[in-house]
Every structure is written in C-alpha cells, then in structure tokens.
Amino acid sequence: MATTRLNPSCHFPASTRLSCESYLGLRTTGRISYARTLTAPRGYLAVKANGGQASVVTAAAITEKQQKKYPGESKGFVEEMRFVAMRLHTKDQAREGEKESRSPEEGPVAKWEPTVEGYLHFLVDSKLVYDTLEGIIDGSNFPTYAGFKNTGLERAESLRKDLEWFKEQGYEIPEPMAPGKTYSEYLKDLAENDPQAFICHFYNIYFAHSAGGQMIGTKVSKKILDNKELEFYKWDGQLSQLLQNVRQKLNKVAEWWTREEKSHCLEETEKSFKFSGEILRLILS
C-alpha cells in the first residue's frame, strides 16, 4: 500500500496528548503520519483502512532518521546553543572562536584602556537589560518563561547595589544610553512575539556573563577599581550548579520545539552578540 507523509504547519498543544479516539471517523485508503519533529519525543499517528472500517494505531515505536545532525545535538539543545555562540567569538576571546578581532573590545582584555565613566555606562545599560529580562520572566504566566523564575542567575539587584556603591564614592550615575534602551525594547518585542528567539537571548545573556563577563569584570576592576569585586560578579550558591539547573530547564523546554523552531533560536545568536557587544563597547567610551 502506498504511503503518504504529511507535514502539517499547525502545532498541537504541548500540554495535551493527541487522542486517537477523535480520529476514528476518518476514512482513507492510504497511510497518514505526522512528522515526529512536531511533538518530539512522541510518536505519530497512523491511520489506515481495514476492510472498509477506519482504525487508528499509535505508532510510537516508529522513528524517522534525521536527515541532518546538528553540532552538539546529541547532548541537548543547550550544547547546540553553546556551539553556535562559541563560533561567534573572536580568536582572541576563545579557542573555538572563528572571527578576527575588528575593534578594541573584541581583542584581549589586557590591552583595554577602560575608564570609570565608561564602566558606569556599561553597568547602567546592563542593569536596564537585566531589569527588562527579569521583569518579563517574573510577570509572565507563559509556561516557557515561568519556569525560569528565581534561577539564582538574576543580576538586576546586584547591579543596583553596585551603582549605589559608586554613588557613595561620589560618582554621578548616568542615564541609560541607546545600546541598553534599544536592546531592552527588542527583548520586550521578542517576549511577546517570538519565544524561541527570546530564549536565545536569555541563554546568551546569563551564560556569557557567567563566563567571559566574569573574566572581564575581574580584569577591568584590577585596572580602574583597585581590585574591587562588584556584586555583579557574585552569586549566592555554587555558580556551576545554578547554571546546570538552567541548562536542564532549557533542554526540557526545547524538547517540545520542532527542528525549525530550534534552528530559528540558533539563528538569533548573532543578534544577541551584536546587542551585547554594543553595550560592552561602552566600557571603552
């Protein structure tokens, strides 16, 4: 019997399993299957004719070989995001980086000439971004976002304390500049209209800060703050465990995405780097 495969564009609710009984009225002389990628890791439905009576069987055991393997895919979607992000680093920033340095902030931090004023602009714009990101998560009932409340990676309150410390030292705290404002508005739009892209920024903002961001903070502090350790670079609890907890949650969320949605998320990485790079550049202003 000939087999016809249909890949519908609609999405079935992630929280509800398909009911075979609802399809008992179908009549067909062929075999219809929904691609596994729609609701991975679940199977798909098979509908076939049987002596003039339509019947439905759950073909959970039937799997389809993926046509393309993505780097890191076997370890979970977070590893896919990490792989893409590392490739976007410069060769000076990471061993896996593929880009050449084109501006001072893309080169070795040891060669930077930061200023306190520029660093304050960086901290203020960073706080606006974290305020926005964490406000979206805290105020959302959308399951994809709600699971990331109180992860321990939040930075807005730590930045508030740091800016208060600078104020006590006699520094004037500036207003947010264009890089932070633009990124903040962009995140708000993504949160409403593009959850996969929003999750990409969520991952890159927090994970980049926990690694390269922490290293930058240490070296900049040594140059201009007499080794003062800011709250921005401190976490309550073991950072590695906090990150692992979030990795697990991200992987779980991505299990319900189609391959197309995962690829869309990965494609957003370059924009995340662009926005973050513009804010980082403020340190040298």
From Swiss-Prot:
<dbReference type="InterPro" id="IPR016053">
    <property type="entry name" value="Haem_Oase-like"/>
</dbReference>
<dbReference type="GO" id="GO:0009507">
    <property type="term" value="C:chloroplast"/>
</dbReference>
<feature type="region of interest" description="Disordered">
    <location>
        <begin position="89"/>
        <end position="109"/>
    </location>
</feature>
<keyword id="KW-0602">Photosynthesis</keyword>
<dbReference type="InterPro" id="IPR002051">
    <property type="entry name" value="Haem_Oase"/>
</dbReference>
<feature type="transit peptide" description="Chloroplast">
    <location>
        <begin position="1"/>
        <end position="58"/>
    </location>
</feature>
<dbReference type="InterPro" id="IPR016084">
    <property type="entry name" value="Haem_Oase-like_multi-hlx"/>
</dbReference>
<feature type="binding site" description="axial binding residue">
    <location>
        <position position="89"/>
    </location>
    <ligand>
        <name>heme b</name>
    </ligand>
</feature>
<keyword id="KW-0560">Oxidoreductase</keyword>
<protein>
    <recommendedName>
        <fullName>Heme oxygenase 3, chloroplastic</fullName>
        <ecNumber>1.14.14.18</ecNumber>
    </recommendedName>
</protein>
<comment type="function">
    <text>Catalyzes the opening of the heme ring to form the open-chain tetrapyrrole biliverdin IX with the release of iron and carbon monoxide (CO). Produces specifically the biliverdin IX-alpha isomer. Plays a minor role in phytochrome assembly and photomorphogenesis.</text>
</comment>
<dbReference type="GO" id="GO:0020037">
    <property type="term" value="F:heme binding"/>
</dbReference>
<keyword id="KW-0150">Chloroplast</keyword>
<keyword id="KW-0934">Plastid</keyword>
<comment type="similarity">
    <text>Belongs to the heme oxygenase family.</text>
</comment>
<dbReference type="GO" id="GO:0004392">
    <property type="term" value="F:heme oxygenase (decyclizing) activity"/>
</dbReference>
<dbReference type="GO" id="GO:0015979">
    <property type="term" value="P:photosynthesis"/>
</dbReference>
<keyword id="KW-0349">Heme</keyword>
<keyword id="KW-0809">Transit peptide</keyword>
<dbReference type="InterPro" id="IPR016951">
    <property type="entry name" value="Haem_Oase_decyc_pln"/>
</dbReference>
<keyword id="KW-0479">Metal-binding</keyword>
<keyword id="KW-0408">Iron</keyword>
<dbReference type="GO" id="GO:0046872">
    <property type="term" value="F:metal ion binding"/>
</dbReference>
<feature type="compositionally biased region" description="Basic and acidic residues">
    <location>
        <begin position="89"/>
        <end position="105"/>
    </location>
</feature>
<dbReference type="GO" id="GO:0006788">
    <property type="term" value="P:heme oxidation"/>
</dbReference>
<dbReference type="Pfam" id="PF01126">
    <property type="entry name" value="Heme_oxygenase"/>
</dbReference>
